[in-house]
Every structure is written in structure tokens, then in C-alpha cells.
Curated annotation (Swiss-Prot):
UniProt record, GO biological process: glucose metabolic process; glyoxylate cycle; tricarboxylic acid cycle
Gene Ontology molecular function: [isocitrate dehydrogenase (NADP+)] kinase activity; AMP binding; ATP binding; phosphoprotein phosphatase activity; protein serine/threonine kinase activity
Entry superkingdom: Bacteria
Subcellular localization, as worded in the UniProt entry: Cytoplasm
Xref: InterPro entries: AceK_kinase, AceK_regulatory, Isocitrate_DH_AceK
Active-site residues annotated for this sequence: 369
Organism (species): Pseudoalteromonas translucida (strain TAC 125)
Main function: Bifunctional enzyme which can phosphorylate or dephosphorylate isocitrate dehydrogenase (IDH) on a specific serine residue. This is a regulatory mechanism which enables bacteria to bypass the Krebs cycle via the glyoxylate shunt in response to the source of carbon. When bacteria are grown on glucose, IDH is fully active and unphosphorylated, but when grown on acetate or ethanol, the activity of IDH declines drastically concomitant with its phosphorylation.
Protein family membership: Belongs to the AceK family.
The protein's name in its UniProt record: Isocitrate dehydrogenase kinase/phosphatase 2
Residues the entry annotates as binding ATP: 313-319, 334
Amino acid sequence: MQPRHIAELILTGFKKHYLLFQKTTAKAPLAFAKRDWQAINDISRLRISHYDDRVNETTATLRQQQTEQLDEQLWLEVKKLYQHFLCFHPQAELAETFYNSVFCRLYHRRYFHNDFIFVEATLKDAPAVPVEAEYRSYFPVVDGLKPTIKQIINHFDFKAPFVNLERDIRLLVKAFYKQAPDTHHKAWQMRFDILHTPFYRNKAAYIVGRVVSQSGVQPFIIAVLHHEDKGLYLDALLTKSSQMRVIFGFARAYFMVETHAPCALVRFLNQLMPNKTIAELYNAIGFHKQGKTEFYREFLNHLTHSNDEFTIAPGTPGMVMMVFTLPSFGYVFKVIKDKFGESKPFGRDTVLKRYQLVKKHDRVGRMADTIEYSNVVFPLARFDSNLLQQLHQTIGSSMVIEGDWLIIKHLYIERRMTPLNLFLENADDASAADAIEEYGQALKEMIAVNIFPGDMLLKNFGVSKHKRIIFYDYDEVQYLTDMNFRALPKAKTYDDYLMDEQSYSVAPQDVFPEQLCTFVMPNPIYKQFLMSTHPELIDVNFWKQAQQNIKNGQVSHIYPYPTAQRFIHHW
């Protein structure tokens, strides 16, 4: 095969992937208009599998047309030509990642360096797609603030009427005056830059933009919801970067948003959320493979500019995962152990399936996103002998040492958080009460979207920077509707009552909510905190009703912003 033919074949595979991805994404607005929430979830899951399908197709074609042995000179020329094709491509960075995926499926990891793949983004010095391609500007000085906001709303054809748009705009303007700095209060002192298409997720659409004035740039997010079958309404205005970071958080499902130039969209969002990494923003808008590429580049850059050693991650060691971390880098590396603890009656394949289940599910801000990698290379010098020994003992079949490098065959990477049990050890009563209340709320929100976490011990939950409680241990995750919730059998005789343990049969899917406090909250103070805020969690009927709601087709909406900011309180 000629270099040009190979380069064109890979680029054609990428084009097919991107067109299908955008075609799938474009179904979200109609599903939102029809209030077809199941379709929204189906679209979200389908997009996640698109990428690997197209990579597999392209790889299979190349295998049919060339030998398995790498022709180094040929592939050096292929990469050079491919790079030329991308100079003015609007999705160049995604096309580079697609190339990497195809090459890495074809050849051995010894070729995974910048000569043959795009370890570095080679187009960083090329002319960038202008950010202006992704937004439209509005000038209140021309028509006034209220008419301008009405123009913005009407620009988006939601294919459904508003219940009372005049009321919503009045509440929106009132909220804007309350939240915006004084310098924004005059129409001639500002400009609105609004992204062309809404962001869809779950049961909401979000209009995203920024307010530009002499005092700086401020996020501008409007949440749009359905009022049952009566029509649309504006639900909230958010104008703080910190609020925006929560909405775009790592524990939420990916947004569905149409874009011709993802790099321009990400740069726009990064200006509004400078504390978010490029990788996190690509993930947030659904390009999780690009997020994976950008994250690995961030990791390599961090390794170059740091010298600390890897250590065992803080927290109680698990029976399924070996977890280590680099203290100066805010993530943990999770590797499936060779052997599980006796209380884990399942194997590696089950763990892989459960992590994939969470990846494709609505995480409602309560389940950390994971990045899955194969054949990750670590500098051996950054591991001390004690840690290496522990790795050999627990994940020996998943690691290889080659010269100065440690290669992990398969791992997951998650955001590092403070384990809830460790947080509580050092928390005062007020902080502990808040954390336990958040823990209970996290359980309720996962339950509402048909997720049963399985192991609900405090050690399996983390405390984020925003003091949110996030679940991160997925080896026992199952659908709520697959579980059998039971009340504890009552003692039949006085002798039964005196026994420390009741004698009754328990099936694998059986769950006894009454035992939640017994096993999860042994500290009586924590139990008191939980019972004062979420007493229904130990009521078997609460769990059964949650199951029935899901079976009846009810789809819950978890608000990613404080309910106090909802306009509905001022109707």
C-alpha cells in the first residue's frame, strides 16, 4: 500500500465517525422537544460506543490490505502526509487521536512514540479555528436588555412553546441584575456571546454563553426545562464560574452539543472555566476519547516537571482494585487485582462490565468518571521497592517491567478525592453532619436513576473540592431494579430474639435497608445525623417505591445547581 492511500483511508474512517457522532447528537433536540427522556439516555449511550466501532472498521480494512509487520519508513511517511491533510481541518485534534487509535490497534507498544503516533499535538502551532465560529454576539445597547434576551431565547428553535416566556424573561433579568456586577447594569456596557447550539443532558437544555464588559468576562448559563406537558420554561440563571464548573463536573453524564469545531468550543469554555483542564472539557462535551488523549499529554507533562514518587492511595485498601497515586497529581490509578477477597463472588469480566455500565449511565453528579487505558508506561524510577513489591503481589499479571519502564496492561484513572471515612475522622460536628447529609442525598440521587451502589460503606465515597459526596467504587454496582429489597424477618420465638444473629436465608440479590446504619454507620453520632435528614433510607418501602417508579417509566431530574436559584419559586 502507498502512504497516501493509508493516510486517506484513516482520514475517511475518522470522517465517518465524526459524521455519525454529530448525526446522533443532532437527535437530542427533537427528543428533548418530545420529552422522550429514554431516547435522550439512549443517544448518550450510543455515542460512547461509536468511536471504537469506527476504529475497528478502519483497522480491519488495513489488516486486509497490508502485512502485519510494521514497515517503519512507510509509516513515517503516512504520518507526515496525514499531518499535512489536517493543517486546516476543523477537527484536526480529533483526527490525530483517531489515527493514534488505529495505529495502536495494529502494532506493538514499542512503536508508541512520537515518530509514529501523535503523542504530542503537532498542530498546536497551526492556525487555530477561530472561537468566533462557535458563538453569536448580541448587543443590548441596540434594543435594550429584555428584547435582547428575548432574541437570544427565540434564536434557539426548541420545537416546543414556552408556557410564559414574558414572565421567565422578567425573572431572568431580575436574577441578572442581582447576580451581575454593578458595571453590567447598563445595556450599553456589555455584550452577550452565546454559543450557537444548546447543551442537552437528561431532562434539561442549557443555553451557554458569556457577558463581556469592561470589567471582564462572566459565564451566562440559562437552564431550560419542560413543565410537564404544558411547555417550556426558563428555570435558572447561573453567572459564576464555580457554578459552571459543577454543571460541567467530572461526575456527570456527557453533554450532547452539536459543534463543527470542537477545539474552538473547548477554548471558549476554558475561558469561562480556567480551572478546568482541556481534557475535562472535551470529556464534558462527549469527546471522551479526545479527553483521554489530552489527559495523557497532561500526565506526561506533569511527569517531566515533577520528581515525587508514586505511593499507595490514601484510604482503606480494597479487595478488587489496587490503587496508587502520584501525590503531586490529583488522580488515582486503579488496577484490577489478580485475586479478589472472599466476599467478592465475581471475576474480572464482571468488574469490567460494571465500570462500563457506569460509563454509559447518567452519573447525576454522584459517580466519578473513569478514563480507561491499556499499556500505560510509567517511569520505573518513580516507584520505590516496597510499592513495586505490593504491585507484584496484587497485580502481577497486569504489569510488565521493560528496562526503565513499568507497563500496566490495563487500568482506570479517576479524580482523587478524600475518602469519606478519612474526612469524617478529622471533621468537626458541623462538617460531619453536612457530609453525612450529602452521603444520604448521593444515595437518593443514584437510586433515582436506577443505580444501586452495592457496597455503601463510607470508604467507597469521596469528598470533592466542592464538598460534594461522590461514589467511586463500582465493582458491586447493579441496576436498582435487579435487586430484591426485604425487611428483616421478625423473631418467631423468644430464643430467636436472644440470638445474636437471626437465622434466615439470603439470596445474592437480597438487600436489607434496615441494616444500613448497622454496617455503614457504626458511629452513633453519624447514625443520628443520617436519621435526622434521610430516615427513609432504612425503610424497605422507600427502596421498593423507587424501583416501582423506574419500572413505571418515571425519569428523575437531578438539578446541577442549588434549588434556591430556580425561578419557579418566584412564579
